[in-house]
């Protein structure tokens, strides 16, 4: 019998952290929410309440923005780029030093396996902060030669400066809390912006812990503020606030559209990383063992609660049966259990509502005639667990092939000896365009298919390659803009052009 989360050991520090009713972090202080509302935090592996948070109101968001504005115009503006680098590197080091507590908190309020929690902290959170720390000293403008017809026959100097936009808002999803926090925090700090952050109200624990580390790192008060709360309250207040100059959001397409509407009031910049329904295209010469494990990771990483998930598997007919047999064999043997159990490979879904939503798609797949190869059941035990699920043999118009499920459900279908444009057209039959992958030993085929797939990121012989330096974002209904890499700095910056006239023109 697998151990339960209640019986698995967690550190004394984690237990102490969980025992608190957590306040808001505004202007470097832990303050009570004006709403007086609290929310219990639930462990999705046990359905037990493990901690409690206070919920921010619109007034609390206002206070956070005021603090962020004051810091932006005050002490933070006086800290040079070299000093920002040192502060960010200190924060990254503190995250690594606190990896045990952070990983335990991430497992307990999100449900992912411990191995993945540790990886998202050391392989994503701290690394993203270090990467962008290196950019602090490399953000610069240009000098621009101007035409004689423009100003003073060349007797002038025109230059540009890249300046921080000001206070930025970040709305963090629940599926990868600390990684998403870091990838939004890092470019904001690197560019000299200040922040108001709303974590998902059901997974706020690692963000709350990171605020302690922000303070310990010496980042000035007011630079980073955290307002846990409901999306329709705190999230809406951030999106519409006239003094927030840019919002970064990761989440559903429907909520992203609402954020765009809310941002119209002051025409703030908006970056959106939204839904996905990514294709995985497998050609007959592909390494079948690599494809098998690649498809498993693509579909079931983070229990399928992953915007980049490769949930549409297209396999050439010559190897389709073998690939499906292999994938089903691995999926059906995956160990499902609480993330604190080191043997667990697949944790619970985030909530009862999310599991019900995913199970409704499983039923829709059956009703629309798709063949269920494996899985399709929720587990009869405490926790929001369900089996990894594989469907095949249905047309592309079924719901499970079209709509983002955000759970461990994979739909596979064969393709024949069509030209690459026809195969790509099938892969592109989606309102989304976030990620995708191509599996082949023929590099020419891989590169051609990568160019034809309409997604913001395509990988060849792997799926969803992620690195701080690789720009990431979606096409179509998968979002606006790019995060990561140099492009990830752009939304946090504005360009100011200045011209100095040395002499008056002779006319």
Spans of features found by a protein language model:
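ALDH superfamily catalytic-core signature
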Residues: 254-396, 418-421, 460, 505-507
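Glycine-rich loop-to-alpha-helix module at the N-terminal edge of alpha/beta enzyme cores
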Residues: 50-140
């Amino acid at each position: 019998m697998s151990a339960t989360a209640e019986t698995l050991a967690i550190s004394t520090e984690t237990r102490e952290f969980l025992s608190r009713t957590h306040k808001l972090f505004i202007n470097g202080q832990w303050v009570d929410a004006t709403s007086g509302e609290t929310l219990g935090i639930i462990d999705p592996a046990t359905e037990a309440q493990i901690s409690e948070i206070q919920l921010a109101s619109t007034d609390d968001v206002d206070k956070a923005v005021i603090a962020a504005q004051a810091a932006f115009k005050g002490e933070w503006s006086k800290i040079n780029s070299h000093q920002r680098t040192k502060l960010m590197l200190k924060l990254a080091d503190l995250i690594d030093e606190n990896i045990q507590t952070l990983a335990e908190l991430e497992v307990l309020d999100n449900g992912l396996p411990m191995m993945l929690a540790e990886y998202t902290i050391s392989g994503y959170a701290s690394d993203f902060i270090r990467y962008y720390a290196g950019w602090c000293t490399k953000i610069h403008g240009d000098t621009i030669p101007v035409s004689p017809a423009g100003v003073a026959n060349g007797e002038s100097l025109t230059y540009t400066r890249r300046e921080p936009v000001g206070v930025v808002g970040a709305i963090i999803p629940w599926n990868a809390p600390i990684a998403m926090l870091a990838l939004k925090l890092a470019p904001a700090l690197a560019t000299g912006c200040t922040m108001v952050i709303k974590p998902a109200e059901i997974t706020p624990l690692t963000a709350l812990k990171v605020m302690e580390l922000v303070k310990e790192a010496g980042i000035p008060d007011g630079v980073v503020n955290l307002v846990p709360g409901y999306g329709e309250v705190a999230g809406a207040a951030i999106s519409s606030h006239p003094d927030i100059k840019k919002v970064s959001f990761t989440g559903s397409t429907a909520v992203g559209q609402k954020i765009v509407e809310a941002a119209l009031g002051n025409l703030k910049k908006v970056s959106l990383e939204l839904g996905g329904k990514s294709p995985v295209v497998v050609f007959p010469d592909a390494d079948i063992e690599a494809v098998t494990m690649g498809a498993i990771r693509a579909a079931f990483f983070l229990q399928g609660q992953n915007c980049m998930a490769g949930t549409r598997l297209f396999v050439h007919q010559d190897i389709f049966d073998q690939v499906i047999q292999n994938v089903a064999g691995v999926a059906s043997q995956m160990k499902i259990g609480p993330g604190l159990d080191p043997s667990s490979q697949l944790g619970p879904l985030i909530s009862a509502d999310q599991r019900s939503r995913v199970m409704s798609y499983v039923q829709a797949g059956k009703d629309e005639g798709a063949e269920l190869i494996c899985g399709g059941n929720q587990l009869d035990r405490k926790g929001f667990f369900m089996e990894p699920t594989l469907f095949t043999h249905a047309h592309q118009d079924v719901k499970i092939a079209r709509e983002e499920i955000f759970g461990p459900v994979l739909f596979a279908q064969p393709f024949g000896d069509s030209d690459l444009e026809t195969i790509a057209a099938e892969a592109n039959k989606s309102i989304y365009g976030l990620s995708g992958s191509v599996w082949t030993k023929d590099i020419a085929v891989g590169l051609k298919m990568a160019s034809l797939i309409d997604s913001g990121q395509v990988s060849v012989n792997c799926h969803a390659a992620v690195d701080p330096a690789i720009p990431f974002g979606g096409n179509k209904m998968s979002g606006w803009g790019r995060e990561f890499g140099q492009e990830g700095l752009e939304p946090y910056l504005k360009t100011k052009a200045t011209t100095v006239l040395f002499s008056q023109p002779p006319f």
